[in-house]
């Protein structure tokens, strides 16, 4: 039963180092750091999903950082249910076991999941804007 972390390196996200530190202190044996220029394909995320085994724990920075919308969320939750994977989202303050963030309510979770498509789209838009600016500056 491994503890594994995943974070997408978004250019505009200031909490990246804090999240990595949290994952390390929690005891993650591996922390996957996906580059934002690979956001569309996310090969490391896909590889991580293939490697997770029954009873593992997955620590993510935030659901909108790891998932891109409601359809992916539904697949992800079913995948974790079937494989009995504990999911911990640091900034959403969600622990599927209910141990780490007992103050998080059902309403909080519903609001987080309801806002997921909008937050994921904003993340992609900001990353695309930064990439566009890098291209313009380099030409």
What name fits each language-model region?
Residues 47-51:
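Short amphipathic alpha-helix with an adjacent loop that forms part of the alpha/beta core around
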Residues 4, 23-35:
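Short beta-strand elements in bilobed, periplasmic/extracellular small-molecule ligand-binding domains
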Residues 14-24:
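Short, solvent-exposed amphipathic alpha-helices that sit
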Residues 8-15, 35-46, 61-74, 93-98:
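Acidic, metal-coordinating catalytic cores used for nucleic-acid/nucleotide bond scission
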Residues 20, 74-78:
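Short amphipathic alpha-helical segments and helix-helix/interface helices
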Residues 80-139:
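Phosphate/pyrophosphate-binding and catalytic-coupling "lid/hinge/switch" segments at subdomain interfaces
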